Structure formats: structure tokens, C-alpha cells
Amino acid sequence: MNNKKTATNRKGMIPNRLNKFSIRKYSVGTASILVGTTLIFGLSGHEAKAAEHTNGELNQSKNETTAPSENKTTKKVDSRQLKDNTQTATADQPKVTMSDSATVKETSSNMQSPQNATANQSTTKTSNVTTNDKSSTTYSNETDKSNLTQAKDVSTTPKTTTIKPRTLNRMAVNTVAAPQQGTNVNDKVHFSNIDIAIDKGHVNQTTGKTEFWATSSDVLKLKANYTIDDSVKEGDIFTFKYGQYFRPGSVRLPSQTQNLYNAQGNIIAKGIYDSTTNTTTYTFTNYVDQYTNVRGSFEQVAFAKRKNATTDKTAYKMEVTLGNDTYSEEIIVDYGNKKAQPLISSTNYINNEDLSRNMTAYVNQPKNTYTKQTFVTNLTGYKFNPNAKNFKIYEVTDQNQFVDSFTPDTSKLKDVTDQFDVIYSNDNKTATVDLMKGQTSSNKQYIIQQVAYPDNSSTDNGKIDYTLDTDKTKYSWSNSYSNVNGSSTANGDQKKYNLGDYVWEDTNKDGKQDANEKGIKGVYVILKDSNGKELDRTTTDENGKYQFTGLSNGTYSVEFSTPAGYTPTTANVGTDDAVDSDGLTTTGVIKDADNMTLDSGFYKTPKYSLGDYVWYDSNKDGKQDSTEKGIKGVKVTLQNEKGEVIGTTETDENGKYRFDNLDSGKYKVIFEKPAGLTQTGTNTTEDDKDADGGEVDVTITDHDDFTLDNGYYEEETSDSDSDSDSDSDSDSDSDSDSDSDSDSDSDSDSDSDSDSDSDSDSDSDSDSDSDSDSDSDSDSDSDSDSDSDSDSDSDSDSDSDSDSDSDSDSDSDSDSDSDSDSDSDSDSDSDSDSDSDSDSDSDSDSDSDSDSDSDSDSDSDSDSDSDSDSDSDSDNDSDSDSDSDSDAGKHTPAKPMSTVKDQHKTAKALPETGSENNNSNNGTLFGGLFAALGSLLLFGRRKKQNK
């Protein structure tokens, strides 16, 4: 394969027995930077918090000025404090104030007009009631941005999920699985510095204590710091439990949805408020899976619970339990009820959903007697709904039923609505009731409750005017409202829609949803408005479904996170928007209908492998030969493009190695040189047969790469020199000189026999054994030279002169036998076995010289002058044996031996002749013989000297 590397991206190694290879050891430190995220209790749908403000000049009756009880504070809160609540100098920590607020100003006017216009007028100034609906939320932020895009579980191995086959009915939005109740983690969300404070507050001039005036712009503020354990997961829950006299919200009731946001507006947890239990249950979103070490603080607008805290100038225990941390504080409450007024009204509460005003009016609290009582309500910017039957008239039978909080227990009141006729006029903006109903006089007392709905056609903020026209005075009370800081004006009549659909695995990568393709569970999906503000987030269910509900007409943005191990498929394939993929970010428009076409497809990211082979390059040619074997146990390290080690392995018994599950990208392969081996030559042949060196850069692009090889051979660290010299010199000199002079003057017969036997044997054996055994991976050159010279010179000269002057017969026999045997054996055995990658020179020189000189000279002169017979026998045997053995490896010089044997030096006696002069003749004979022998010896010696 040629996709592996180029000349510019592969690093070769220069062969050198001293090369050192190193592995870069790279550690990834995950910085655990402190994540401090200030969460806030957001107001869903721009929820407004209202504070009712009453500003009046009416004199309070004596029973309204009772001294309140002592203001007591009880704190049962965990003493834990956040370790660091200050801003650091190294980073600018934003302090963001987000106000989802509406200030509702309610102005109440009470006018008393005499029936007789000509009489003296008596004017009573009434108090102005201002209802301020406001929400001020302060954010502080300390964010640790370690792992901003990674979940806390950083295992590279994706979590396995079981995905059920998706239903074919893609428009069946009800198939989306409902969120399951998670684990309660109250013990893992820790609160500290809890406090309940009065915002503004009013000081009682008599007692000097600060009081909560519920109808004079005051609100309560719940504040706390918190930390969240990292073990908290998406779907886990925790709770806020409010006490008997305390609830979230203001004059405007708390929304059922109570989301928690961070400073950037991201949803941390989704809260659901249950007014029955006065508890908010929060469910964590996947935000806690993406961030660690979350901590922060919050400030929440709260209010007195009017149904329970009913009496002015009374201290009530305001208690709250956040998670497992409880805090309480006693606060004096005052609603400003004016019991001397014949007509007074208050906003009992503002409905959070439709923003309707739920009003309560007290009629004839002083219990005056009238002959005329006409109660009229005029609405500006609001309307009555006659079909709702929520205009109620109750007769008061007990003065105590006029509770100060304007939230009477209607179950204890007498409902007399049916006894009166409510006349609606002015397009349901005016309601008139004659409270006399044919009676001539009456001192009856009434509590009237009404609901006024916002009129969407109105351009102003509206007001509610009351009049009580009696025979004595015409009383008026006016409540006006104004919204400030852009509170939500949406009403409950607006229809809500759904948006969402499906995330699936596009196994064939065609960008279209096929029937056999399954959904992907656990994909994060975020919903944003047209301005990029996050509205909601969710996670796909086991079938890959997701859905956002309760949305108004408008343009939205949906963002999909890429699940681990997947790659986004091609977006917007074909013309059918219901079955294509809309990509990672898409825009969805809601126009009077659900939009369930926002899908995203992913396919599993292909994984690739690289590797191959490390071999023993025995012939050092840099090529993989069929006879060459792999090397086991070579350490191979894989690094990514950043130099981080992502894998380490060792070659198997066949020299093979492999790295799997790799994405396309750039990598570096590092081979650690085995001890005692040397890097072979690199890039000598085809890419799948060569050596690539100690470090190799490789790029994988949608393919495997099994061409990354490396070869080594043994280092030349063993030198063997074996020199074997064998010199064998064998010199054999054998000189045998025989001089025989025999002079005989006689008349006898002379027989002279001269036998000369000269045997010269020369044996020269030269054995050279040179054994040089070197076992190593080196190269051995063994030269064994054996020179064996065996020279044998054998000279046998025999001169026999026989002069006989006689009358006798002279027989002279001269026999000369010269045997010269020369045996020269030169055996040279040189065995050199060398297995080595080094050089070994073994020189074995064997020189064997065997010189054998054997000289046998025999001169025999026999002169006989006699009449007698002379027999002269001269036998000369000269034996010269030379044995020369030269063994190389064991140097033993051979000493030549020269042996000359004269076996017949004694002349044979002639036979007796019977002469009387026998003895004399014998003496003469012996003398002649000795003379001949002496002459022979003398002659031989001279000859030798001359030679």
C-alpha cells in the first residue's frame, strides 16, 4: 500500500549499532479547574413577580394598631460555607442581572359623595394602592471550563445502549417516552448562607421593627449559595419545600414551571411547583453531565402565603428546606386592611398563566345601615367572562370573616350570588349589582370576588374601578396596573404547539430514514428562540425520539449534539423533509401547527487499524525475505498528532503488531530497538517489504495501513582471530663411508667380494590440524596454509678397484645395494566453523620441511699379488631412517635419526691350505685385509671431506 507515508512525513533511521531509540512519554493532565456556575430560579415564559403597594392617608382604627409579637429568627441551616465567594483577580467574572419583571401599579381611590349636592361636601382621601410586579434576579458566575464539551465519564469506550426498533408512524408524537423519575439527590446538593430578607421593608415607628408590608411594594427574597456533587446525573431530582406561611412568587402566583439557569441562560434543572404541597421538584438536565464542580448562588422572590398568614401586625415563621438544609425566620406581616372603610378592595392574586386579576372587595365592613347600595365595577383593559360564573357575592355572618389578607375562607361564607342579578354591559367591561334587592334598608355586609381577564385589544395596561353608591355617600375605589420591564403578556387562550421528532442511525449513509434503521438513544437536543436564547433541552429516548412542548408560533433553532462514536450524515438529501437529516443545527417554524420534521441522522464513525511486522534481517539487505523470521517482544508505541501516547503494544511470536479502533488522522509509530540489535537499512524496496525506521509518521484516510515494518540485525560485537602456525623442519644426514684397501701380493687366488648395502629411509609426516570454532553472529575468514617440504637425498657411491697381479685367480665381487626410501606425509586439517555477524580471521600456516641426506660411499681397492687365493668380502649396509612428524595445533619438531649399520666388518677367513706356514699365511692374509680395510676407510674419509 502506498497510502502510508511520503518522503516528507516519514522519519527514517540511519543504521548504526549505537543507535538509541526513545519513547516519548506524554501525560494528559486534565485540569480540574473550578466550575462555579451561578444558577438562578428562572421565571419561565418571562414570569413576572408582583408586589402590591398600598399608599394611603386613611386613619387606622384602634384594633389595627395592636403591637406585634417579637420578631424572632430561627436558623437550622448547615453551617457549611462556600470556600470562595469572591471574584478572582485573574478573570473577569460577569455579574449578570436578568429581569423578567413587570411592575404592576394598583392605584386605589376612595371618594365619598353626599346624596344632596347642595349639602356640605365631606371628602375623604383614600389610599393609593400600587402593586409592583417585579422580579429581580442577580447572577454571579465562577466557571471552570475543564471538560466543557466532554461528559464527566471520559471513557473512550462508548456506553452500550439497547435501541428498540422505531415505530413506522413518525408523526405519532405521543410515542416519546415520558421522563422517568430520577434519583433523589437532596444529599448531593449542598446549600449554605441561606437567608430570607425583606426587600425594602417598612419600619414600625412604634416598635422600631422592620415589617413586611405586603401591599406596599414589599417582597421577600430567599437567598442561598450551593454546590452540586459531580456524581449527580441527568434525571436526578432535588426539592425546595416551603413552610406553612411562605411560598415562591409574589402577588402573582408562582408558575408551575420553575427552571434553574446559569449566568449564560443555560437550563441546569427543570422545576415543577406543586401548590398543593408547596414544593418545587427540580430535575437536572444533561448540563450536569457536561460540567464538573458546579457551584453558585441564587436569589428568589417569595411572598407570604395569604391563606395561612392572615392577620396584620403578626410575626409568622417563614421556613424553607432546600435539599436537606432547613432555614426559618420570623417576619411581621401587614396587608393594610382598613376596617373602617365601607368599600376597600385588593388584588388577591394574579394568575400566572392567563394574567387574570382575582379581586376581593369588602363592602360595609363598618356595618352601616343603608337604604340604597349599588355596587358597580368598571374595567379598562379587562373584561368579564359571564360564562365563567366567577362573579361571587358572599354575605358575611361573622365580622372575623373580613380577614386582613383579603383571602377569606369562602367555605364559611354564605353564597348569595343567586339572590342578585349581575348586569353586564359595555361589552362585558361593566358589571352592576343592586345589593338592596327590594329591601328598604339593610346593614348587611358582603364580600365580593371577581375575575378580570386582560383584553388583548387594549393598548393600555388597564385599571379596575369600584363604586358603592349609597343613600349617604358614593364611595369609589380604583385599582390601576402598569407593566414595567417587559413582563410577559401572553394569556392562557393562546394555543401551544409541539416541535421535535427523531435522531436515527443512518447505517447506509444515504441521508434518508429507512424502515430498518433504528433511533439513537441519549442524544442531547437544545431548543433556542430566534435570538439564540436557550429555552429548553432534552435527551432522545430509547427510540431516538425527542419533543419540545408548549411552544407558541414562531421561529426556533434546534441543536443536536454528535453522539460519541458517530459522524453526522449528509443533510437535506432529497425533497421530503420528513425523512431527511437536517444536520447538527436546524431551524424550525411553528405556524398554527406542530412541527415534527426536525430530524438528524448519524452513522457510526469507521474505525481503522495500522501495524504489521518487525523482523530479523539476517542478511542486512533491508528487505523482508521469506526465510527471515519475526522478532518477538519489540515494544511499539502509537502517538496521535499532538504527540500524546494513545497505545502501546509488543510484537507477538511472529513479529506481528497491530493498533485498532483508530479514526482517520495523523499518527506516529515508534519502535523501541531491541537490546543487542542494530537498525537495518530503511526504504530499500516496496513499502510492504521494506523497513521504515525507528519512528514513522503515517496518515490514515479512510483505510487500514499494514505496511509499517521495521527490521534489525545482530550487532558486530564479536571478533575472533585464530592464527595457527606450524613449522616442521626435519633434516636427516646419513653419511656412510667405507674405504677398503686390500693389497695382496701372492700367488694365491684372491676372491674379493664387496657388498655395499645402503638403505636410507626418510619418513616425513607433517600433520597440521587447525580447529577454529567461533560461534557468534560474525563473519569468519579462515585461511589454512600447510606447506610440507620433504627432501630426501640419498647418494650411494661405490667404487671398487681390484687390481690383481698374480698368477692366482682373483674373484672380486662388488655388490652395492642402495635403497633410499622417502616417505613424506603432510596432512593439514583445517576446520573453521563460524556463525557470526562480525569478522573473524583465522590463519593457519603449517610449514613442514623434511630434508634427508643419505650418503653412502664405498671404495674398495683390492690389489692382490699373490699366488694364494684371497677372498675379500666387504658388506656395507647403510640404513638411514628419518621420521619427521609435524602437527599444527601441537607443535612437535621431529628429530631425525640416522643409523648406519656395518654388519660385516670382519673378513671371512680363507680355507686352510694345509701349508705349514699356515699361521704365517694367516697373518699375512689378515694384514692384507686390514690394510685394505684401512685404505678403504681412509679413502672414504677423504672423499667425504672433499664432498
Swiss-Prot record:
Q: Which family does it belong to?
A: Belongs to the serine-aspartate repeat-containing protein (SDr) family.
Which organism was this protein described from?
Staphylococcus aureus (strain USA300)
Give the membrane topology, semicolon-separated if more than one.
Peptidoglycan-anchor
Q: Where is the composition biased (Low complexity)?
A: 912-927
Q: Tell me which domain of life the UniProt entry assigns to the organism this sequence originates from.
A: Bacteria
Q: Does the keyword Calcium apply?
A: yes
Its biological purpose: Cell surface-associated calcium-binding protein which plays an important role in adhesion and pathogenesis. Mediates interactions with components of the extracellular matrix such as host NRXN1 to promote bacterial adhesion.
Any single Gene Ontology cellular-component annotation: extracellular region
Q: What is this protein called?
A: Serine-aspartate repeat-containing protein C
User: Could you say which residues form the signal peptide?
Assistant: 1-50
Chain intervals with Basic and acidic residues compositional bias: 72-83
